[in-house]
Swiss-Prot record:
Binds voltage-independently at site-4 of sodium channels (Nav) and shift the voltage of activation toward more negative potentials thereby affecting sodium channel activation and promoting spontaneous and repetitive firing. GO terms for cellular component: extracellular region. The keyword Heme does not apply. Keywords: Disulfide bond, Ion channel impairing toxin, Neurotoxin, Secreted, Signal, Toxin, Voltage-gated sodium channel impairing toxin. SMART domains: Knot1 (SM00505). This is Neurotoxin LmNaTx34.1. The keyword Signal applies. It comes from Lychas mucronatus (Chinese swimming scorpion). InterPro entries: LCN-type_CS_alpha_beta_dom, Scorpion_toxin-like, Scorpion_toxin-like_sf, Scorpion_toxinL, Scorpion_toxinL/defensin. Belongs to the long (4 C-C) scorpion toxin superfamily. Sodium channel inhibitor family. Beta subfamily. It is found in: Secreted. Residues 19-85 form the LCN-type CS-alpha/beta domain. GO terms for molecular function: sodium channel inhibitor activity; toxin activity. Disulfide bonds join 32-84, 36-57, 43-64, 47-66.
Length: 86
């Protein structure tokens, strides 16, 4: 019984983290991925400002990718949130 309680408490303490492309949330590019070419510093800084652990420029997609964001973060780009019109 103590083990079950310990597991439940551990699951409540562990924060679920998500990875994904950073998304523009305002302005003319709202809903688009944050684009980049080779600027890892910019992507890393923006990722950390949004609560992530590490960000980098994913060259093949030309977009900032962020690791360690909270799963419920509104800053992760998904197809459902894609309101970007090229």
């Amino acid at each position: 019984m103590k083990t079950v309680i310990l597991v439940v408490i551990a699951l409540m303490v562990i924060e679920v983290q998500g990875d994904g492309y950073l998304m523009v949330r305002a302005g003319i590019e709202k809903g688009c991925k944050i684009w980049c070419v080779i600027n890892n510093d910019y992507c890393n800084r923006d990722c950390k400002l949004k609560g992530g652990t590490y960000g980098y420029c994913y060259f093949w997609k030309l977009a900032c990718y962020c690791e360690g964001l909270p799963e419920s973060s509104p800053d992760i780009w998904t197809y459902e949130k894609n309101t970007c019109s090229p």
